[in-house]
């Protein structure tokens, strides 16, 4: 864990994404290390917010015509909004979602599917560093067994051992009269 730069909330989010939070128990020293890292990043963020408050924010550029107003294609092509700051994970507020261009939205969606933090958390706390976190098994590479036949749903009469196959097998069994 000493080599990881993940904060407390990053670790919790990664474990909950993989539904493995019940398998990990942190010691008191590990919790202190995780919270100290998050305190350090919080202090860095507060300092940068104070410096940003002095600088005026640029005006938002309309990138969709349906929002009203005119769209400048040159300005819209150069605009990039930050979508990684959302506190609710993949939730993006409606106003911000409407302002995203299709390229920004695809980057946000790709980041949501990527699960980079979850896999890093799995490597550090569950699988140990250096191991592959989730092995990929390809169905193409696996050999097909000729012996493995398709399983068929069959109802067998207990008295005469008659077999009924198909979608109407229950009704056929009810109408069946055993010949003993």
From Swiss-Prot:
The keyword Transcription regulation applies. It is found in: Nucleus. Disulfide bonds: none annotated. GO terms for cellular component: chromatin; RSC-type complex. Its main location: nucleus. Keywords: Chromatin regulator, Nucleus, Transcription, Transcription regulation. The keyword RNA-binding does not apply. One of its GO terms (biological process) is chromatin remodeling. Interacts with STH1, RSC3 and ARP9. Component of the two forms of the RSC complex composed of at least either RSC1 or RSC2, and ARP7, ARP9, LDB7, NPL6, RSC3, RSC30, RSC4, RSC58, RSC6, RSC8, RSC9, SFH1, STH1, HTL1 and probably RTT102. The complexes interact with histone and histone variant components of centromeric chromatin. Component of a fungal-specific module (HTL1-LDB7-NPL6-RSC3-RSC30) within the RSC complex. Component of the chromatin structure-remodeling complex (RSC), which is involved in transcription regulation and nucleosome positioning. RSC is responsible for the transfer of a histone octamer from a nucleosome core particle to naked DNA. The reaction requires ATP and involves an activated RSC-nucleosome intermediate. Remodeling reaction also involves DNA translocation, DNA twist and conformational change. This is Chromatin structure-remodeling complex protein RSC14. It comes from Saccharomyces cerevisiae (strain ATCC 204508 / S288c).
